[in-house]
Regions:
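Short, structured segments at the rim of ligand-binding sites
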Residues: 1-439
């Protein structure tokens, strides 16, 4: 699909969609609980549908209802944490890294004989050292490095050791699986943890289902790195009856950034300022640029002001880098975005694709090691860009187009369906002029 955008100011109010990150976690916990759970979720997307497919393949029954999902669990009961092996089917993860990295340890903890498949770059994205720990715990994984990936054997409880500089999804996946094991287990992380807020979301979701994760941090000393122990007891997830998925800061960030570079304020309603989502820090970043921020209990408003570049780290907010780079492109002076290494293994190599597509629109962006250096310009030009089948690159380009001097054409615009199928509808709601065409 091709999106043809005529530059037009974006302004007004838009509702937040459901947090994709939290929806994954709550639906997984619900499918593993001791009874039915109603999950209120105001939107869905391709990634969430992938998680639902995988849980269904493991025996859960998940009904789509008007306001979300009714989840009938995989297991009706768990006695002393002992589970019978499941004859799992094919688990189709689509292009969702979260689905694969969460469901692989869960399937192995259940003792499922399952076959994982996926699409796009997913098969090439790394699974080690998560896969190493699963194998060490007694499971057999055949086909690592691509698809199909076959699992057999049941994961033994124990201590799972991961470095802190790997995907937080590995840590979250092991945490989600831990209550299914026959005895208490520990996920031990050495060194500074990247994207820690996502682990906090996992702990929050597990707590909603009666599972406590005890966290012990041992500071670095005598030349040894810090160690964080996440200890989880064995036993069943316990349904609270109903849970609600909060609004999504990751996708709200696109509209808030549009407000920062536009001529009029933009408000996103339905986001919690007390959320554990790391991407709520988009407000702090935009404030550092100089944008005007208005916060309320359930909404945030951003309006442009004189923007100036600064130095920031992407350590805990890697998914914000593309759209923050668009803001930086229109800020005076230089912006340095550090700690971007993890962007290379997303749906695209986002260091490369962010640089390439913003440059195609007249920005001055260059890569220096694992950092981005961006020199501000007065406006984006028109031009043609490619999403590289990456939802965040497509949405970044659309936000940049609102401040372009000519028409912007986005190839592969259907990539937004991965996380935000209503993106272009909401773009029009805010006054954007976009037509969608078949390529």
């Amino acid at each position: 699909m091709l999106a043809r955008i005529t530059p037009s100011p974006l302004k007004g109010t838009v509702p937040a969609i459901a947090s994709k990150s939290m929806a994954h976690r709550l639906i997984i916990c619900a499918a593993l609980a001791n009874g039915e759970t109603h999950v209120t979720c105001n939107t869905t997307c391709a990634d969430i549908e992938a998680t639902v497919r995988c849980l269904t393949a493991l025996g859960a029954r998940i009904e789509t209802v008007e306001d979300g999902f009714q989840v009938h669990p995989t297991m009706k009961s768990v006695e002393f944490g002992l589970l019978k092996a499941l004859a799992g089917g094919t688990l189709d993860c689509g292009e969702s890294g979260s689905t694969l990295r969460f469901m692989l340890p869960v399937a192995c903890a259940l003792g499922a004989e399952a076959t994982f498949v996926g699409q796009g770059r997913l098969g090439a994205r790394p699974l080690s050292p998560l896969s190493d720990e699963i194998i060490a715990a007694g499971c057999d994984l055949q086909g690592l490095g691509g698809f199909p990936l076959k699992t057999s054997g049941r994961m033994r409880p124990g201590t799972f050791i991961l470095p802190g500089n790997v995907s937080s999804q590995y840590i979250s996946g092991l945490l989600l699986a831990a209550p299914l094991l026959a005895q208490p287990s520990c996920v031990q992380v050495t060194g500074l943890i990247e994207s820690r807020p996502y682990i906090n979301l996992t702990i929050q979701a597990m707590k909603a289902f009666g599972v406590e994760v005890n966290v012990e941090r041992i500071p670095a000393r005598d030349g040894q790195p810090e160690v964080t122990n996440f200890r989880v007891s064995s036993g069943s997830y316990r349904t609270p009856g109903s849970v609600a998925v909060e609004g999504d800061w990751s996708n709200a960030a696109f509209w808030l950034c549009a407000g920062a570079i536009g001529t009029d304020p933009i408000t996103v309603e339905g986001v919690s300022l007390s959320s554990a989502q790391g991407d709520r820090n988009v407000l702090a970043a935009l404030s550092r640029f100089g944008a005007r921020i208005v916060r309320s209990t359930n909404a945030a408003t951003v309006q442009s002001d004189k923007l100036a570049g600064f130095e920031m780290s992407a350590h805990d907010i890697p998914d914000l880098v593309p759209v923050i780079s668009a803001v930086a492109s229109l800020a005076q002076g230089r912006t340095f975005i550090r700690d971007c290494a993890r962007l290379r293994i997303k749906e695209s190599d986002r260091l490369a694709t962010t640089t390439r597509e913003l440059t195609a629109l007249g920005a001055q962006v260059r890569i220096a090691g694992d950092d981005l250096i961006i020199k501000g310009v007065d406006a984006f030009t028109g031009g043609e860009v490619d999403s590289h089948n990456d939802h965040r690159i497509a949405m970044m380009a659309a936000i940049a187009a609102s401040r372009a001097t000519g028409e912007v054409v986005i190839h592969g615009a259907e990539a937004v369906n991965k996380s935000y199928p209503d993106f272009f509808d909401h773009y029009r709601l805010l006054g954007g002029k976009v037509t969608l065409e078949e390529e």
